[in-house]
Amino acid sequence: MGVRVALLSVGVLARSQKENERRLPIHPLHVDRIEAGLRPSVHLEHGYGERFGVPDEQLADRVAGLRGRDHLLADCDVIVLPKPVADDLRQMREGQVLWGWPHCVQNADITQLAIDRRLTLIAFEAMHQWSGDGSFHVHVFQKNNELAGYCSVLHAMELTGITGEYGRPLRAAVISLGAVGRGAVTALTALGVTGVHVLTHRDVAAVAAPARSARVVHFERDPGDPARCQVLGGHGRVPMAAYLAGFDIVVNCVLQDTGAPLMFITEHDLPAFTPGTLIVDVSCDAGMGFSWARPTSFADPMFTVGANIGYYAVDHSPSLLWNSATWEISEALLPYLKAVLGGPAAWDSDQTIRQAIEIRDGVIQNPAILSFQHRAAQYPHPRL
């Protein structure tokens, strides 16, 4: 008879300290789906289902109980919080596990707190399903990524008062066709934008157009300036900035290589763009893609560059449609709850979880964090 392994306790938080973040990790209507054997280890924050019209009384007998945030942070082994900020980690005790989107590579403060407090960070953004040969198959939270593209386009077009269905015809360029790009094209098509060009670094013949009216074109790094790009079309090689200047809406959906980032448009390129052009930076990384790039917030979602060119870069745009986003996050997360609560041995036996651990007991596991933040390889990973 096998030895029964004690499960870790998990605290599922209902509120983020990130302004206007409304997504939850488990949809209140999905709590019934939690395996019976896991429920004694699952604790929810008071008011967990409030925004969804689900009272605590309806959830109480389906989990170990509902408790205040401070009690969950003090007592639970694992904290599930989709969008943590540095202050959340400051409230955690040494040795705890955080499961969410920490984005450690670009976030030195969160990384340092995890090191100092010997935390383990299991990153949603690094959770992938893998093929039998060890190759990448699909991102676990791809539907949330689609929603990022969808919500960013929806919100930005609303803020600028435009739609393709009415008013002058609009043309849009979407850079990259992963899940984020598919969501962006879905929104553009739904909003009546018919002239959509999708730019991909893959072979055009290997890429299916995401919409009947979309045209797929190829781009690649400029051999003479690898940080810049060229578009290969019927007229030969064209600098990407010049190509993009022919569109009313430009949507960036590129997952940047932080070690060799791409630059699509700089301030020097802006005079070629028509006033009123809208740039939607879904996959915003500060200083990458656009020379002025920086994340924005729901409180101040856009700013103007050049001659009245709008720039949108809300870094958690799926929170716009928080109920639908919560549903998709929950669908993706629940199959991995057992492995996470199983503790270190269970993590190591599950490839998706094992490879999503960015920091383990304070020790950095992802080399990209070390290189981007210029840290030493050995704990405590001082900045070099």
Give the location of each predicted region:
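Rossmann-like adenosine-cofactor binding region
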Residues: A205-A307
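A short helix->loop->beta-strand "cap" motif at the edges of active sites that frequently abuts
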Residues: R39-P40, R93-V97, D116-L119, V193, ...
